[in-house]
Curated annotation (Swiss-Prot):
BP GO annotations: L-arginine biosynthetic process; protein complex oligomerization; regulation of arginine biosynthetic process; regulation of arginine metabolic process
Protein name: Arginine repressor
One Pfam family it belongs to: Arg_repressor_C
Location in the cell: Cytoplasm
S-S bonds: none
Role: Regulates arginine biosynthesis genes.
GO molecular function, one term: arginine binding
Predominant localisation class: cytoplasm
Sequence similarity: Belongs to the ArgR family.
Key word NAD present: no
C-alpha cells in the first residue's frame, strides 16, 4: 500500500521550479519595497531560495517587472503588473490603464500615426505595459524608454486622435 505525499507549503520546495520561484518574487515585490536585484536575491535567499543574478533578471523580465521611480526621481522600486502575468489583454485593463494615466501621464504629442506619451523618469515601461494589457483595438503596440512611450495607432486612427484619447482618459 503506497502513501500519498502531502503537498508542500510555501518554501524552498515549492520555489525549486521556475513557476514557484516567480510566484515568490511576485509575493515579495507586492509586499515589500525592493530597490535592487541584490536586495531581492537576499530576500529570496532568506527564504532558502538561491538564485543567480542572470536567472533573477530573466524572471523579472518574464514577470513584466519594472523599476518605477516617483515624480521626484528618487530611488526606484520594483513593481509587477497587478496579476503577475505576461502582457496580454486582461479584464479591467482599461480601468487600470486610465488610473495609471492619471498618475503617470505628464504630457502628450503626436505625429502621423504615432502618439508620444511623457511620464516621470522610470515610469514609461510600467504605463506602456498597462496600455498593452488594455488591448485597445486602435493601438498596434508600444515602445517605452525611461520617460517616453511611443504608441503606434492602427489605421484609420491617427496619432492625434490617440494622444487625445489618452489625455481624456486621465
Amino acid at each position: 500500500m503506497s502513501r500519498a505525499k502531502a503537498a508542500p507549503v510555501a518554501g524552498p520546495e515549492v520555489a525549486a521550479n521556475r513557476a514557484g520561484r516567480q510566484a515568490r518574487i511576485v509575493a515579495i515585490l507586492s509586499s515589500a519595497q525592493v530597490r535592487s536585484q541584490n536586495e531581492l536575491a537576499a530576500l529570496l535567499a532568506a527564504e532558502g531560495i538561491e538564485v543567480t543574478q542572470a536567472t533573477l533578471s530573466r524572471d523579472l523580465e518574464e514577470l513584466g517587472a519594472v523599476k518605477l521611480r516617483g515624480a521626484d526621481g528618487g530611488t526606484g522600486i520594483y513593481v509587477v503588473p497587478e496579476d503577475g502575468s505576461p502582457v496580454r489583454g486582461v479584464s479591467g485593463g482599461t480601468d487600470r490603464m486610465a488610473r495609471l494615466l492619471g498618475e503617470l501621464l505628464v504630457s502628450t504629442d503626436d505625429s502621423g500615426n504615432l502618439a508620444v506619451l511623457r511620464t516621470p523618469p522610470g515610469a514609461a515601461h510600467y504605463l506602456a505595459s498597462a496600455i498593452d494589457r488594455a488591448a485597445l483595438p486602435q493601438v498596434v503596440g508600444t515602445i517605452a524608454g525611461d520617460d517616453t512611450i511611443l504608441v503606434v495607432a492602427r489605421e484609420p486612427t491617427t496619432g492625434a486622435q490617440l494622444a487625445g484619447m489618452f489625455e481624456n482618459l486621465r
